[in-house]
Amino acid sequence: MNRKVLIISRGFRAGDAITTLNLFAKWPKDSLFCASMLGTEFASEFSAFYLLGNDEIKFSFPFSFLTHIDESVIVKGGHNATIDNAKRKSLKRSIYENMLLPVLQRLDLYETRYKMRLSDKLAAWINEISPDIIYTSVGDIPMANFILEVHRRFPEIKIAVHCFDDWLSPTYKIINESKHNNKAEILLNEILSIAAYRFTSSDKMASEYKERYGYTFRCFPNPVRLSANDNAVFKSTVPNVVFAGKIGWHNNLAIKDMISCIENLKNQGSDVRFDIYSDCTVEQIEYFLGEVPMSTVFHKPVPNKQILNILNSAHALFLPISITEHAEKFTRYSMSTKMGEYLSTGVPTIYCGPSTIAMTEFIKSRKCAIAVENPGPQYLESALRAVIENNSEISAMCSRGIELARSYFNMEIVSQDFANELNKEL
């Protein structure tokens, strides 16, 4: 019998949510619960979903002035009540994102902009559902403190920690970075000491975390749901590169390089286009990317069922990580949630990232994508020209990617292995 699992997440949405649901694909819905402060579109996937709200989340000024927090509720069906950031496209929010936010990050006030506490309402709900395991990826200092508080109240519930990235090192610059890292390190060490299960998403992370913290970590790749696509795929007459996902400090410079690459090719007479599918607000796009030329087209995010058709129809897919010191620290152990899905399409993938991180090492060793390890649009231009030429080497690369998706990233294989691990006797 499957144990009851409560997933506690900062934001259960987009690729992170899909990856987690794919990991729990073998789990019966009546044994799966979730508590999250953002995102309820996947609420129907759970027996019950607790939307963390103003009972558990307290923002400090000026964040309390800029962020509306809904009431804490048990969500049913897929009701879309969330912390309302994206809807507030006001002057004060624009000033905050473009002027105040960088200062707060620099002074290390961003990570602690809110605190979380275990409310009586949430404690009563946890008592009611009586989970055997709490599964969390932590992700920041407030969530780390929150997980520890929940454990102190419910010490009998086993903790499963899944480390997807090295969140102890933020992607933005901090004046006193060592102080921030030490604080986060102490919290993560405490969580790892009480955890019954310790997981990572890359072998590099499992190996180096064992050396760093002294615990054994089990690696589970980010699984992808493979589907037989019998429909004919129609490529657009205009060669295009597609990126689907978040835009932030970890990848904005790489995306800007691709934007410049496409615009340079356009100016040289090549008819090419860069299609970006993201849920970023206009303010966020301006903040992270600046002014964008017409050769780059932004699209609203599409349902997950449709994204595979978009990826299949592309001439090339783009997997970006900014080649900077701070992005390298944050992503050194990460594996993109999109990688398996990209590879499964058989469409050539252009990857950009620092040479020392897990994704770069994986892609180069498996020879499943074109790896660009230097910043600058000229390097992406060379990669894109190789894709357009589509020689036998590119075809072989794509075939290796498909095989990896069917074996290493296959949801049926990974999720069964994951279920066996969580259900075994400790």
At which residue positions do the language-model features occur?
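Nucleotide-sugar-dependent
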Residues: 250-253, 305-307, 317-340, 349-361
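Carbohydrate-associated surface elements
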Residues: 204, 222-223
